[in-house]
Structure formats: C-alpha cells, structure tokens
Curated annotation (Swiss-Prot):
Cysteines engaged in disulfide bonds, as pairs: none
Function: Catalyzes the hydrolysis of the adenine ring of phosphoribosyl-AMP.
GO annotation, biological process: L-histidine biosynthetic process
Phylogenetic classification of the source organism: Bacteria, Bacillati, Actinomycetota, Actinomycetes, Mycobacteriales
Protein name (record): Phosphoribosyl-AMP cyclohydrolase
GO molecular function, one term: phosphoribosyl-AMP cyclohydrolase activity
Organism: Mycobacterium leprae (strain TN)
Catalytic activities: 1-(5-phospho-beta-D-ribosyl)-5'-AMP + H2O = 1-(5-phospho-beta-D-ribosyl)-5-[(5-phospho-beta-D-ribosylamino)methylideneamino]imidazole-4-carboxamide
Length: 115
C-alpha cells in the first residue's frame, strides 16, 4: 500500500521517517496511547480502518490487536497544524496499553486536577 501523495507531502517526519500518532477513544474522549507511524502504516490504517503502527524496537509495522485481540477500529484520522502528528479516533476493544490497561495513561499521575 502506498500513501496518497497529497497526504504524504503534508507530513513532517523525523530522521527515521516516522511521525507521532496520538490515539483517542471515540466514546470517552480518553487518550489511550501514543505510538509511531511511517507512511505505510498510515496508508494501511486509512485503507483498512485498522490501527497500524511502527515499532521502533522491532523495526517493523504492527497491527494493534493482531496478537492480543485488543483491536482499534479507526473512526477518523486528523493531521495536526504542524504536520508532524496524527490523531486517531478509535473504537477500542479491550485494553489499549501493552500492560492490558485501558489506557497507557492510567497509572502515573504527575499533577492532579485542581478542584
């Protein structure tokens, strides 16, 4: 799969050809995770509506939930104003975090909300 050239020209990638993907749950608005994408991962995501990412540690693409069953059906994808981050709005099945938690941001609060 090849990324649409009209989309590709708008992306700003790091030295490794990657850009950030922020993943938000459609039903709750919760931020679930942050991951990396390359052009092919984004192209596959746009084509299939299955969240595809790029693993820097394994140096390969992966489909969220392909082994765990904790899938992400992609409702929408938006590009930020700088072109270096995409926002995926998803319907999450199971936990989004590799630990099994609902969100990767469930455990370590550094500053609590003020009432």
């Amino acid at each position: 799969m090849t990324l649409d050239p009209d989309i590709a020209v708008r992306l700003k990638r790091n030295a490794e050809g990657l850009f950030t993907a922020v993943v938000q749950e459609r039903s709750s608005g919760d931020v679930l995770m942050v991951a990396w994408m390359d052009d092919q991962a984004l192209a596959r995501t746009l084509e299939t509506r299955e969240a595809n990412y790029y693993s820097r540690s394994r140096a390969e693409q992966w489909i969220k939930g392909s082994t765990s069953g904790n899938t992400q059906h992609v409702h929408s994808v938006r590009l930020d104003c700088d072109g270096d981050t995409v926002l995926l709005t998803v319907d999450q099945v199971g936990g989004a975090c590799h630990t099994g938690a609902h969100s990767c941001f469930d455990s370590a609060m550094l500053l609590a909300p003020q009432d």
